Amino acid sequence: MSKILEMLEQEQMKTDLPAFAPGDTVVVQVKVTEADKSRLQAFEGVVIAVKSRGLHSAFTVRKISNGVGVERVFQTHSPIVDSIEVKRRGDVRQAKLYYLRELSGRKARIKEKLAKK
């Protein structure tokens, strides 16, 4: 029984996702349906948490909008998520960056991870 479930989940999982980690700045293109029209809306921010659970994987993105912190949790393999683009890699040493909620301004900045030679 579990093999059948695994096969069904494997079929529904997206394969074209980029590798990203907490601390990375990403742009998530989200499909928004208003009345009968559908459009893409960009949500750009820092990934503060990643939950890897196969088909049920999720990640949390945080951004500051008009001086107010906005966090949004996206299901990684959801059909609502159209695409994910990594803008810059962040150099952090923790898996969950919830401490960024308390910081503001320059203290909330994350160092950029430099490419290896």
UniProtKB/Swiss-Prot annotation:
GO biological process, one term: translation
PROSITE patterns, alphabetized: RIBOSOMAL_L19
Entry GO terms, CC: cytosolic large ribosomal subunit
Sorted UniProt keywords: Ribonucleoprotein, Ribosomal protein
Disulfide bond annotation, renumbered to this chain: none
InterPro entries listed in its UniProt record: Ribosomal_bL19 (IPR001857), Ribosomal_bL19_CS (IPR018257), Ribosomal_bL19_sf (IPR038657), Translation_prot_SH3-like_sf (IPR008991)
Top-rank lineage group of the source organism: Bacteria
Family, per entry: Belongs to the bacterial ribosomal protein bL19 family.
PANTHER family listed in its UniProt record: LARGE RIBOSOMAL SUBUNIT PROTEIN BL19M, RIBOSOMAL PROTEIN L19
Protein name per its UniProtKB record: Large ribosomal subunit protein bL19
